[in-house]
Regions:
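Active-site metal-binding loops of divalent metal-dependent hydrolases
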Residues: 2-6, 34-37, 100-102, 150-152, ...
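Core catalytic region of metal-dependent phosphoesterases/phosphodiesterases
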Residues: 6-128
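Short gly/ser/thr-rich secondary-structure transition/capping motifs
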Residues: 12, 128-131, 157-161
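A generic local structural motif
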Residues: 16-19, 82, 133-135, 161-167
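A structural signal for short, well-ordered beta-strand segments and their strand-loop junctions
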Residues: 30-33, 93-98, 133, 147-149, ...
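Short acidic low-complexity segments
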Residues: 124-144
Length: 198
């Protein structure tokens, strides 16, 4: 699930559709590639402008939690029925790669130390919903495929980017990789010297 960007003012019904898709496909793992929560109240790009007025952190958090409620509703309904019938429940492993939008919380507490302890990633309740979180700019490898919100390059730690991002990722990382962040689909396949496809 790439870059869902749950935010106040947007319809979260799309999360129900994604939850239903998960129930139809029944994957062993569900990986969110980050930016589940948009957190516009913590944006540094347009802070201080008239367009920024009215944004509230609490509303951002409530939108992200509502999105999770909607996403997990089909799974919850399914498992309640299975529990009633004493049948095996479906419990996929859930991975949440934190993205740059979730990192807005960390940056806010670093630039305004008085917020430290008052706000945090835990407000989004990811772990309560069963997600195993992967820190921002970190990766997790499942079945030989590495997942991250984005991959970095160079000493500045900037995101790898390109018009042909799939090609750039396999060329720089030399492994099978999936990332979010760009909001675009791109795919490339290479063959390593040992014959393995990446």
């Amino acid at each position: 699930i790439p870059d869902a960007h749950a935010a106040p003012g947007y319809d979260n019904e799309r999360f129900t559709a994604v939850g239903q898709f998960v129930m139809e496909e029944r994957p062993e793992y569900v990986v969110c590639l980050g930016d589940w929560a948009d957190l516009p109240s913590l944006s540094s790009y347009d802070k201080g402008t008239r367009g920024f007025e009215g944004r509230r952190y609490r509303n951002d958090v409530e939108s992200a939690i509502d999105a999770q409620d909607k996403f997990f509703a089909p799974l919850k309904k399914h498992n309640e029925q299975k529990r009633k019938n004493k049948e095996k429940q479906y419990k996929p492993k859930l991975i949440m790669c934190l993205g740059n939008h979730e990192d807005r919380i960390t940056r806010a507490t670093q630039s305004s130390p008085e917020l430290h302890g008052a706000i945090g990633i835990d407000d989004l309740l990811y772990q309560k919903y069963g997600w195993k979180t992967v820190d921002f700019k970190r990766a997790i490898t499942l079945f030989g495929i590495t997942f991250s919100h984005y991959f970095t390059s160079g000493i500045a730690g900037r995101p790898i980017s390109s018009v042909h991002l799939g090609h750039t990722l396999v060329s720089k990382l030399h492994c099978s990789a999936v990332q979010g962040h760009t909001h675009l689909y791109n795919h490339a396949e290479h063959t390593r010297p040992d014959g393995q496809k990446i």
